Swiss-Prot record:
Name listed for the protein in its UniProt record: T-cell surface glycoprotein CD5
Phosphotyrosine, modified sites: Y453
TM regions (residue ranges): 373-402
Membrane-protein topology: Single-pass type I membrane protein
Signal sequence residues: 1-23
Residue intervals on the Cytoplasmic side: 403-495
Changes after translation: Phosphorylated on tyrosine residues by LYN; this creates binding sites for PTPN6/SHP-1.
Superkingdom per UniProt: Eukaryota
Function, as annotated: May act as a receptor in regulating T-cell proliferation.
Region called Disordered, residue ranges: 475-495
GO CC terms of this entry: external side of plasma membrane; plasma membrane
PANTHER family linked to this entry: T-CELL SURFACE GLYCOPROTEIN CD5 (PTHR47309:SF1)
Name of the encoding gene: CD5
GO terms (BP aspect): apoptotic signaling pathway; T cell costimulation
């Protein structure tokens, strides 16, 4: 048996020797089919060819290229064109794409992109060749999914976005412009006049009017909330006096490092807040400021306090006081150690308070009407409307209520009790001093009586003094808990 295996082993060794000397078996790839695999895209992936029966990966050292990174893209343009792709981008090893285990490799020689002289590689497993080309333009409708937040729909109207520094202001920052599916910042030159353009941008963002350009030191610190820097410059100013956004800018090649357009609009938030402390009331004292709610109050340092009253007039209005009465810088002996400084001008236009470590000079401001201003227009109108409503109610409901009260009082006066008034059974009469027996023919309705017991009903056998007769009857009989008197029963019910 061992003697039979020796010729086979010798034949195998001879085949390996021939392969190593000749570079492998020659593979016929006439009428080849070419594809890119491992990426899911037909224009990027591992380069593979087929002769109609089997697919082969192309060796990364094909065509004698020791460094494929230095290959000019035009040299493998033909490969991209045969794959029905656009311009070539990269030809390199396929380490970035998924490899297929035990796939056969071919190594080709001659002109780059030619498969006329290829042989099967039987050496150790090496990287295959990868090709990346530009995708062809889409001919189908765009997907219905919404685009990323940084890039609007191609059909969306032009728009702006302000990118502020972390924790920065609203309506202030670096301007990003989006139009036709392209988004980026706007490059400017020092000589550019952006006042009119700034008005257009602030109005489009509903941020009021243009206030001033964003200082370069702050512009360099701006970054997106996600932690990314603003987009690269892709636009430049074409017409600073434009009235339509489409006419303002033109596209440029993306570049980083230039100065991008940044601005501050008048409606920036939060605004600087002020108060007066150390005086007799809230309308008098030295000025303190802070940059929004939740921030600490500190002294306003102002060395230019004698240049105008506009800043102090605004401070008085914010305290809901009258006009400024006087203002003065405090004596040098009263200087504080530090505080906040803001450039000259009204505080509502000061977008950032700068800290001053020393030599901070305070300003003492006195406003007119040291007490709080009177009621506002809204409160006065509310009081007037309330008084008018009360007058209408009195006119409409007053007479009716008066009549009801008078009627109730008269009824109470007429219903006075005639009969025993206490435990001693004393008599109480509400009658005239004399009683006149009226004839039956007299018209009872023609005479006025003071109460309903002035005379008995007609054709009645009841006495004119039933209460008196009842009292005499009780005296003559033994007292008990029962009573035959209608008046006593009536009295008990009333009590």
């Amino acid at each position: 048996m061992g003697s039979q295996h020796l010729p086979l082993a010798a034949l195998y060794l001879l085949e390996l020797l021939v392969t190593s000397c000749l570079g492998g078996l020659k593979v016929e790839v006439q009428g080849l089919t070419m594809r890119l695999s491992g990426s899911g895209s037909r224009c990027q992936g591992r380069l593979e060819v087929s002769n109609g029966t089997e697919w082969y990966a192309v060796h990364s050292q094909s065509w004698g290229q020791l460094s494929l990174y230095q290959v000019a893209p035009r040299q493998f343009l033909k490969l991209c064109q045969e794959l029905q792709c656009r311009d070539p981008l990269l030809l390199s090893s396929s380490r970035y794409f998924k490899e297929v285990q035990f796939q056969k490799l071919i190594i080709c020689h001659g002109q780059l992109g030619s498969f006329s002289n290829c042989s099967l590689n039987r050496g150790r497993q090496v990287d295959s060749l990868a090709l990346i080309c530009l995708e062809p333009p889409r001919t189908t409708a765009p997907p219905t999914t919404s685009p990323p937040t940084t890039t609007p729909e191609p059909t969306a109207p032009p728009r702006f976005q302000l990118v502020a520094e972390p924790g920065g202001l609203r309506c202030a920052g670096v301007v990003e412009f989006y139009s036709g599916g392209l988004g980026g910042t706007i490059g400017i030159e020092p000589q550019n006049d952006i006042k009119d353009l700034g008005q257009l941008i602030c109005a489009a963002l509903q941020c009021g009017s243009f206030l001033k350009p964003l200082p370069e030191t702050e512009e360099a610190q701006t970054q997106k909330p996600e932690g990314q820097r603003p987009l690269p410059i892709r636009w430049e100013i074409q017409n600073p006096k434009c009235t339509s956004l489409e006419q303002c800018f033109r596209k440029v090649q993306p570049w980083v490092g230039g100065q991008a357009l940044g601005l501050i609009c008048s409606d920036f938030q939060p605004k600087v807040q002020s108060r007066l402390v150390g005086g007799s009331d809230v309308c008098e004292g030295s000025v303190e400021v802070r940059s929004g709610k939740g921030q600490k109050w500190d002294t306003l340092c102002d060395d230019s306090w004698a240049k105008g009253t506009a800043r102090w007039e605004e401070v008085c209005r914010e305290q809901q006081c009258g006009n400024v009465s006087s203002y003065r810088g405090l004596d040098p002996s009263e200087k504080t150690l530090g505080g906040f400084y803001c450039p000259p001008g009204i505080l509502s236009r000061c977008h950032k308070l700068e800290e001053k470590k020393s030599h901070c000079k305070r300003v003492f401001v006195t406003c007119q009407n040291s007490s709080r201003a009177g009621l506002g227009a809204g409160a006065v109108m509310s009081i007037i409307l309330a008084l008018l409503l009360l007058a209408v109610l009195l006119v409409v409901c007053g007479p009716l209520a008066y009549k009801k009260v008078v009627k109730k009082f008269r009824q109470k006066k007429q219903r006075q009790w005639i009969g025993p008034t206490g435990m001693n059974q004393n008599m109480s009469f509400h009658r005239n001093h004399t009683v006149t027996v009226r004839s039956q023919v007299e018209n009872a309705t023609a005479s006025h009586v003071e109460n309903e017991y002035s005379q008995p009903p007609r054709n009645s056998q009841i006495s004119a003094y039933p209460a008196l007769e009842g009292a005499l009857h009780r005296i003559s009989t033994q007292p008990d808990n029962s009573s035959d008197s209608d008046y006593e029963l009536h009295g008990a019910q009333r009590l």
